[in-house]
Amino acid sequence: MKRTLNIGIVLCENFLSDQQNAVDSYTQVYEDVRMFEFGLKLFQSLPFNIQETLIFCNAEQHKIVDKAAKKYKNTTVFFSRDTDVANVYEAKVFIQEKYKLTQDYKKRGVSSYYDSCCFILIEANRPLTAIKTVKSVYEKALIEKAAIAVLPYNGTLMNGNNDVVFSHLQDKNRFNYWKQSKAYEVQYPQAYTLNKLNQFSKQQFLRARSMLDLMKISNKSPLSIVDGSAYAFRVVTNLDFEILLGILKNG
């Protein structure tokens, strides 16, 4: 019996970056859409029933993404201008509100967003990630019905300004994050994760620590646990995303 999932895909190249010139911007959007279409084809061949595919993109991507999405059934595209959505949490809320995932919606037989959704933020041109890492993290997420989110990249982290990155990890009135030091969570993600897992056993933490070590997490690629079982990490370049989807397809 196939398991039923909702798939949420966010195309977020330039999600928090400055506006590029029209030619470069269009080229990147086209590349994102090509990757997104490749992903949809592979998702459809996975051993899961895909109930709904939710695609979030920014305004400049909307027209071309919407055109591509019309080829696939049960696919909905949402978009917002950069000023409306500043980070991954707001993107999730934006989709949730637009999709109207209420109790009435559940009664119509559709799974709630957080109960069964594989939520992927596609962010092109990210550092390479080992295939073994991608496979292990995504398998764990699928088994646990977890949401997978990628923190929007901001170049200020590379220049030592961790305040911007921390703003993506902060409470937003929904989570209780460790406040000892704004830089500490980003520079030492293992310690940050331990704090987030302190309600679980040491063995469970060690498994998470092993995953972090495998992913070679550093201060340049922070990881946070978003919704308890939801992992956030940077994904990869277009080629690596295709490899990832191939792994999901072929096991």
Swiss-Prot record:
Q: Which InterPro entries match?
A: Nucleotide-diphossugar_trans
Name of the protein: Uncharacterized protein MG116
